[in-house]
Amino acid sequence: MNFGKPAAGGNPLDRWHDWKHTLSGAPASLRFIFAGIHRTVTLPFMPAFALTIFTGAFLLFQVQPLVGKYILPWFGGGPGVWTTCMLFFQLLLLGGYAYAHAVSRYLKPRTQAILHVVLLAAALASLPITPNDAWKPAAGDDPAWRILSLLTASLGLPYLVLSATGPLLQAWFRRTSPGTSPYRLYALSNVGSLLALMSYPFYFETNFTRFAQAQFWSWGLGFYAACCGFCAWRIWKNADEVTPSATAAASPAATADIPNPTAYQRALWICLPAVASTLLLAATNKMCLDVASIPFLWVLPLALYLLSFIISFDSPRWYSRFWFTLLLSAALIGVCLALFAGADMPIVQQVVIYSAALWVGSMICHGELYRLKPHPAHLTAFYLFIAAGGALGGLFVALVAPAIFNNYYELHLSLALLVALLLVVSAQDHAALSPRRWRVLAALLAVGAVYGADQAVTTVIAWLRTTAPALFSTVEYFWANTQHAGLHWPVWLAAGLLAALVALLRRRAQPLDGHRTTCGLLGLGLGGLIVVLGVQMRETSRGSLLTARNFYGVLSVQEYGQEDPSTHYRLLLHGRITHGIQFVAPERARTLTSYFGSRSGLGLALRTFPRQQNQRIGLLGLGVGTVAAYGKTGDYLRIYEIDPAVKQLAEKPFSYLATSDAQIELVMGDGRLSLEREPPQDFDFLIMDAFSSDAVPAHLLTREAFAIYLRHLKPDGAIIVNISNRYLDLRPVVENAARAIGFMSYTIECEDGSDDEEQGAWWLYGSSFVVLSQNRAFMENYALRNAASPAPATLNTIPLWTDDYTSMFRVLK
C-alpha cells in the first residue's frame, strides 16, 4: 500500500481529499478510522480541537498499561492489580467529567480557559508519573487501598486533567461551532484511546523499556498541554466575539425549548455503562486468571469495549437491536459452554468466546446509550452520567464483589443484567418488529429457554439422586443414557420442534402483538439464562467445604471420598486449578501429593543433594504446605506467602505445616519484595512455587528476580522452580535466567501418577521443575542428570526476561 504524499500548499480540505484517495487501497478497518477522522477534522474550527482531543485520549489510555506494569510486581502479579487500576482510572474519569460539567455550566468562557491552563501547568509540574519505591507495600497493607493511594499520588492530577479533555473541549467547540454535532469528537477520542491500547503491547512494550515509555509519555503530555493551551487561548480571545448563532444557542430563550432528560433516560445513562463496565472487568478477570495478568490481556478487552463506543457513537446505522439480540444469544451460548467446560477448554477458545461476548454486550449497551443521547445542551451531563455508571461498575467488581461473593460471579450477574436491560429498553420501545424478524427471534429465545429447563432438570435429578435414590433410579438411568456432551437429546428434540413451530407461524401479528410477543419471549430467554447461570454457579461451589475470596483471587477447599477412609481427601483450588491435595486419614496425612511426589524434579533434587541434614529451605508460595512434608528434624523451612487466606487454609483444615518435623516460619507478603528487604538467608534450597491460578507471576522469573534469589543462596545451594503450566512453556525463560547468573540448569518432567512406592498414584500430577545450581557435584549426579529432559530446538529463541521486558506471546504452548 502506497500512502504517497499530499500535495504541498493548497486548501487543507483538498489535502485531506488527497489522503482519502490515497487510502482507497488500505484495509477496511483503517479506512473506517480514517473516514471518521476525515469527517471530523474538515469541520470549521475542528482541527485544533480534534488534535487536542485525540492526543489527550491517546495519553489517557496508554498510561494505563504502563503504570499497571510498573506496580504489578509489587502486589503479587494477579488480575486484582489491573482491576483496581481500572477502578482508579474510572473514578478519575468521573472526576474529570464532573469538573468539565461544572466549569462549562457555572463559569464564563474566559474563566474556564484560565482555570484549565493553571491545572495543565500543575499537571506538568507533577511529572514524572513513575511511582516511587517508597510506595511498595509492607506486610499487612490492604493492597486495593494501597494501589489507589499510590496512583493518586503519582498520576492523579495529570490523569484528572486528561479525563476532562473530551467533554470540556466538546463544550468549547459547541460554543465556536453551533449547529454542528460534537458527538463525532467523542468517537474521535475513542479512536485515540483504541490506538493507544493496541500500540502498547505490540510496539511500545516490546521496543522500549518502562523508563523510556514513561519519558515518551511525559513528552506527549507536554505536547498535549501546548495544544490544549492553544484551544484555551482561542476560547479566551474569542469570548466576546462568539457568533450570533452560538449566542442564540446558549441563551435562556433557546435552551428553554430544549426538553430536559427524563428520570428514565438518566437511569439508563447510568445503568447501561455500569453493566458494560462490569462486563468488561469480569471478562478481563476470566481471561487473566488462568494465563497471566499481562498488558495484552488487559488491553484486548478494553480495546473491544472502546471499539463498541467508536462504532456506536459514529452513526446510529451501525447498531441494530434485532441483529445484536441474535448475536447476544449466540454469545451467551458460547459463554455458558465455556463456563461449564472450565479449564478443560483451550485458552484461545476461552479468549475468543469471552471477547466476543464482551464486544456484543458492549455494543448493546453503547448502542442503546447513543439512542438515548440528549440535546448537545446537556452534553457534559450526559458524559458525567456515563462516567458515573462506569465508575459504579468498577467499584462493584474491584471492591464490592470480593466482599459479598465467595467466587467469581460478576460475569454471571453482568450477563443477566445485560439481558434484563435489553428487555427494559425493548419494552419501552413500541416500534414493532416485522413478523419474519420476531419469529426468528422467538425461535432462538425458545431454544435458549429450553436449554435453561434442561440444565434445571439435570440439577434437580442430581439433587434427588442423593436424597431419594430408590425412587428416582429409573429416571436417573434414562437420563444418564440419553446424555451426549452434557446435553440431552429428548430435550433438544423438543427444543427443535418448538423452534420450528414458532418460526413457521403464519399469523401476521399486529404491531403491538408482535412487540408484546418479542418482549415476552425475551423475558423467557432471560429466565432461561438465569437458570443456566445459576446451575453453573451451583456446579462451581458443589463439594466445597470452605470458600474464601479476597484481592488475590478465590480459594476453595473441596472434599471427596468420604465413603472410604483410604481415599478420603481434601484439595485446594485457586480459581479452577488445584493447588494441593491432602488425605484426611492421619496415617496418610503426610503423603506427598499433587506436583511434589518423590519422582518430581523437587523430590529428586532434595533426595540427591549432598547435604541431607540441617537444611535451610526457602519456599515462595505456600499452597497447602505439601513441601513441608519433606522437612526433617533439624531442617528450617521459611515460607513466603502473599495471600492471608492461603495461610489460614493451610493451617486448617490442612495439616502439613502442623505435622512437619522441620522448624517452620511464615513470612507474609510478596516473596520477591520480602527477599529484597531481608538480609541473606543462606538457603540450601530456594523453591519457587508461587502461582495465581494456573499462571506464574512474571516478575518472579526475571533476571533481576534471580539476582535477588542468588543473594539468599549458599554458594553450593540450588534454586528449584515449578514451571508446571497448561498454557505457557516457561522452560526457556528460567533456563535463560540460569545462564544470566552463571548457573547450570536441568528441566525434569514427571508424568501423572509417578511414584517410587506405588504405581498409578492418582493423587500425583504431572509436573515440570527446573533445577538451577553452580554446585557441579550436585548437578553431575547421575540420577539428576539422567532424569533431565533434552533441550528443545527453540530454547535459545526466547529473549531473556527482565523487569523491563517480558513477553507471554513468545512462550505460549
Where in the sequence are the language-model features?
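Alpha-helical transmembrane segments of multi-pass membrane proteins
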Residues: 37-796, 803-813
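Intrinsic disorder/low-complexity segments
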Residues: 1-44
